[in-house]
Each structure stands twice: as structure tokens, then as C-alpha cells.
Regions:
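Extended low-complexity, serine/threonine- and proline-enriched intrinsically disordered segments
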Residues: 94-110, 150
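Surface-exposed, proline-anchored Ser/Thr-rich loop/turn motifs
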Residues: 55-86
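C-terminal tail/sorting-segment detector
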Residues: 25-37, 145-166
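Short solvent-exposed strand-capping/beta-turn motif centered on an Asx-Ser/Thr pair
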Residues: 88-93
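Short, compositionally biased serine/threonine- and acidic-rich segments at solvent-exposed termini, linkers
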Residues: 20-64
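Short, surface-exposed loop/turn motifs with a glycine/proline- and acidic-biased composition
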Residues: 118-153
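Sec-dependent bacterial lipoprotein signal peptides
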Residues: 1-22
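Surface-exposed loop/edge segments in extracytoplasmic proteins
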Residues: 106-115, 157
């Protein structure tokens, strides 16, 4: 009895295995994202990193090599300042738009910014108000460590990171 495996069958098995591995990596990434914020990447107003939190602003497995996220700056940020996020599309058609979301203390999600440009090309710099990170827009509600998420418009998580509002 001959054992015969065709090249298309072997390639199909390899693609299926790679797909499962990537899906597992994305699922693990998203599980990390939904844990409570702990620590943050400290940055200057010029986006220089002072201390790096290895968990902050990683690019998800689905977007690695396609999107680069510059950590939020300045971080920490005062309630009377604004802070920036930079999202760089490394290739044309990497993503078709995105949204920036914060999880409020009552677990509601609040959209801070939406970008509908399709496709996103180059670097997009977003200016955000830390008062929007609180439940009622007050300085008291905004203070503390807040987690921000970045999703594409298809609902796939691109990145997440923590902001300290002082």
C-alpha cells in the first residue's frame, strides 16, 4: 500500500497550523489587553521614552509588521494638558480606518477618536484630552491609570496601552 501526500495537501495542513497559531496568539494578546491596567510607559512631551512598560503599546499579532504604535506622550499627563498617540501604517492598505477607545470605571466603552480614512497611509498623529478618560469629564474622574485600546473598523484589536492622568 502506497502512502501518498500531495504538495497541496501538505501546504494546506501547514497553512491551517499557521492560522491556528496566529489565532491563538491574537486571543492571548486580547486576554492580556483586558486585564486591569498596571504600569505605564513613561514618556516626555517630545515622545522620548523614559521608562518602558513591556506590556504597553505592543502591536497585536494580526497587525505585526503592518502597523507601528508610538507610545502615548506625554505620559503621565496632567488633566489640563493634552496627549498624543501616533499610529504608523507601514504599508498601503494595512488597515481601513481605526478607533481609539477607553474603558471607563463602570466598564462602559467610550470612543475617543475614529479615523475613517481608507486606506490609512503614513503616520497619523491623534491629539486626545485626558478629561475624556473619566466617566463624567471631570478632572477627579479622569485621574489615575487608564487603559486605551486601538481597534480597526472591523473590530480587530491593534494595540492597547496605559495612560497615567495626574
Amino acid at each position: 500500500m502506497k502512502k501518498f501526500f500531495s504538495i497541496p495537501v501538505i501546504l494546506g495542513i501547514l497553512l491551517l497550523t499557521a492560522s491556528c497559531t496566529r489565532n491563538n496568539a491574537q486571543r492571548d494578546f486580547e486576554q492580556d489587553a483586558y486585564t486591569a491596567p498596571a504600569g505605564y510607559t513613561e514618556t516626555t512631551a517630545q515622545a522620548e521614552i523614559i521608562s518602558l512598560d513591556e506590556d504597553d503599546w505592543r502591536t497585536s499579532p494580526l497587525f505585526q509588521g503592518l502597523i507601528n504604535i508610538v507610545p502615548a506622550y506625554p505620559n503621565p499627563v496632567a488633566t489640563n494638558q493634552q496627549f498624543y498617540l501616533e499610529i504608523e501604517s507601514l504599508f498601503n492598505n494595512s488597515i481601513n480606518g481605526f478607533e481609539v477607545i477607553v474603558r471607563l470605571p463602570n466598564n462602559d466603552l467610550y470612543t475617543l477618536y475614529q479615523e475613517f480614512d481608507t486606506p490609512l497611509t503614513g503616520v497619523k498623529t491623534i491629539l486626545l484630552d485626558p478629561l475624556e478618560l473619566g466617566i463624567d469629564g471631570s478632572p477627579e474622574a479622569a485621574r489615575g491609570l487608564k487603559r486605551i485600546y486601538i481597534f480597526d473598523l472591523d473590530g480587530q484589536m491593534i494595540s492597547y496601552g496605559d495612560i497615567m492622568v495626574e
